[in-house]
Regions:
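Secretory targeting and sorting signals
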Residues: 1-26
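Inhibitory N-terminal propeptides of secreted protease zymogens
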Residues: 22-104, 226, 345-347
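Structural recognition of the beta-strand scaffold that forms the well-ordered cores
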Residues: 33-36, 71, 90-92, 134-138, ...
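Solvent-exposed loop/turn segments at secondary-structure junctions
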Residues: 39-42, 66-67, 77-79, 95-99, ...
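C-terminal subdomain of the subtilisin-like protease fold in secreted/lumenal serine endopeptidases
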Residues: 60-61, 194, 212-232, 237-243, ...
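Active-site-adjacent substrate-recognition loops and nearby beta-strands
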Residues: 103-106, 121, 125-128, 162, ...
Length: 382
């Protein structure tokens, strides 16, 4: 039976835009790098230890699941020696990921929009709840005690400080609330797992993000229905793209933000990963949000402007914010609804199902720069 739930309007705060900048280089010539090893390497931890001794690499993370490799602070003078090791596939300079915040007043409407082809009717209809599906939230953590989650938010992984993946920023709790909150969520029965890769200031690094993806890949059980949400992004990174691709190959459907630069999404990671569901943002009038990235790397759009969801400051607080960060969890939630009813669908099949079922031609204000952008708006019948 399809349930109907009235939407709650809350007029509050903040829009978030994500960007990436190079990690600062230390004055002694050392900087943070991601060292990706050949797939044939069986023991990346051993190679990392060997490189630490031979080249003075100060290892921060070791990757075993989503890719083989490690991150470390390394003297740039040692990079030539590292690259000469035939077990090294390539080396990337690490990048920081940060969140910029502005304010606005608005109310939530996203759930109302995705369950019908046209307009709004102040309700959200659904059959499935996402029960039995795991949703990994790769973000700032989750306030797992929030009333929106009803005990469905469980312990996860913390790449920032090895803690409990608690959210001291708010962004991750908001994203989780849109995926699976009891009031504001698409999939109201999904299990939510925090994967904390951004700190209390909303800052992190690609090396930490890869550590989170690596943990997700290792935690995911073969054949188990699962989705992952990445409402973050930054400059192009082959290592990040590879980690996401390998996690998808393991059976986890990834929804990733297109980005908030009003630019071609193909310039950014992980938005440019073809196997992922790359999501742009729309406004309440079905216009492309002015900040949303665009282009052929997008798969579809979803509501992203003025979205109300859970917040981290108490077990009942909410916040209203904007961005492709807010559009992406709508897609992750619908993917979870689909997987409840069809748990053996592969990530490629889920992506195809969501694209083919989307409302066609509904998004306006794409503009000439958006040539090649698929005009598809998220729709759920699940």
């Amino acid at each position: 039976m399809r349930s109907r739930r009235l939407l709650v309007a809350v007029g509050l705060v903040a829009s978030m835009l994500l960007a990436a900048v190079p990690v600062a280089q230390a004055s002694n010539g050392r900087a943070s790098f991601i060292v990706v090893l050949d797939d044939s390497v069986d023991a990346p931890r051993g190679v990392a230890a060997e490189h630490s001794q031979a080249f003075g690499a100060d290892v921060t993370y070791v990757y075993r699941n989503a890719l083989k490799g490690y991150s470390a602070r390394i003297d740039e003078a040692q990079l030539g020696g590292l690259r000469a090791d035939k077990r090294v596939a390539y080396i990337e300079r690490d990048q920081d990921v940060t969140i910029d915040q502005t304010t606005e007043n608005a109310a939530s409407w996203g759930l109302d929009r995705i369950d019908q082809r046209n307009g709004l009717d102040n309700s959200f209809s659904y059959t499935n709840t996402g029960a039995g599906v795991t949703a990994y939230v790769i973000d700032t953590g989750i306030r797992t005690t929030h009333g929106e989650f009803g005990g469905r938010a469980v312990s996860g992984f913390d790449a920032v400080d090895g803690g409990a993946a608690d959210d001291c920023h708010g962004h991750g709790t908001h994203v989780a609330g849109t995926i699976g909150g009891s009031t504001y969520g698409v999939a109201k029965g999904v299990t939510l797992v925090p994967v904390r890769v951004l700190d209390c200031n909303g800052s992190g690094s690609w090396s930490g993000v890869i550590a989170g993806i690596d943990w997700v890949t290792g935690d995911h059980q073969p054949g188990a229905p699962a989705v992952a949400n990445m409402s973050l992004g930054g400059g192009a990174s082959t290592a990040v793209d590879t980690a996401v691709k390998n996690a998808i190959a393991d059976g986890v459907t990834f929804a990733v933000a297109a980005g908030n630069s009003s630019a071609d999404a193909c310039r950014f990671s992980p938005a440019r990963v073809p196997e992922a569901l790359t999501v742009g943002a729309t406004t309440q009038t079905d216009a492309k949000a002015s900040y949303s990235n665009y282009g052929k790397c997008l798969d579809l759009f979803a509501p992203g402007s003025s979205i109300t969801s859970a917040w981290n400051t108490s077990d009942s607080d909410t916040n209203t914010i904007s961005g492709t960060s807010m559009a992406t969890p709508h897609v992750a939630g619908v993917a979870a609804l689909l997987l409840q009813g069809a748990p053996t669908r592969s990530p490629a099949q889920v992506a195809s199902d969501l694209a083919s079922g989307a409302t066609k031609g509904a998004v306006s204000d794409l503009g000439r720069k958006s040539a090649g952008t698929p005009n598809l708006l998220l729709y759920t019948i699940y």
